[in-house]
Amino acid sequence: MDLLDVDYWDVLEKKWGMHYFNDIYNVMLIDLIEEEKENGFSVLEIGCDCGATLLEIKNRFPKAEVYGSEINVASAGIASHVANVVVNNIEEENLPFPERKFDYIIFGDVLEHLHNPLKTVVYCQRFLRENGHIIASIPNIQHISVMEGLMQGDFTYMESGLLDKTHIHFFTYNEIVRMFHEAGYEICSLKGSGVPISDRQNELIDQLLALEGRAQRFMYIAFQYNLKAKMRKDVES
């Protein structure tokens, strides 16, 4: 069977709830792990899918201990071949790991799918070691493609992308900063990554920036934000 055949991926989604991007690792998040190749450290990925990101972490850092939490049983079964994986709904707050176990906890396009992402990132503090980090990729609802639709009165959910029909929460740069500050984190890095935009969209950004407000150009260009954060000293226990 041709793995590029759309029907193949439709079958996987309908039968197993798996998507084509489940086996693509997130290079931008992995690049936020600042460790020497021979260092030993522990990583937990929330929503690890089929384990592609954890596998690439293990390839880059052979001494890393990799763990995953995944709600989809079929995906977790595949990921278990490369990591210690538990079938778990993170919002139920019952991770079976000891406190202060992990140097990194990863949320790769996960927080937008949660009913209470603030509560979840607070809950995960107990599993971070001293100087441990949260690493996350979060889609940007302020991207110019969404703003362009709103100007036409459209906010139509899609099968994937910024308006993915499974998204429960939406984030802008300011909302990400606000949530992690409220949760007790210090943001070490928060950078946008983008996709090409048209000349017309660039013109729209110029028009939006001419309006009164605090928005900056990057807030309309970033398709998603990649974050690295650690617990603030005043909230560590």
Model-predicted segments: where are they?
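Adenine-nucleotide cofactor-binding loop residues
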Residues: 91-93, 111, 142
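A short glycine-rich, Lys/Arg-flanked "PGG" loop and its adjoining helix->strand segment in the class I
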Residues: 119-133
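Acceptor-substrate binding/catalytic loop of class I
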Residues: 158-175
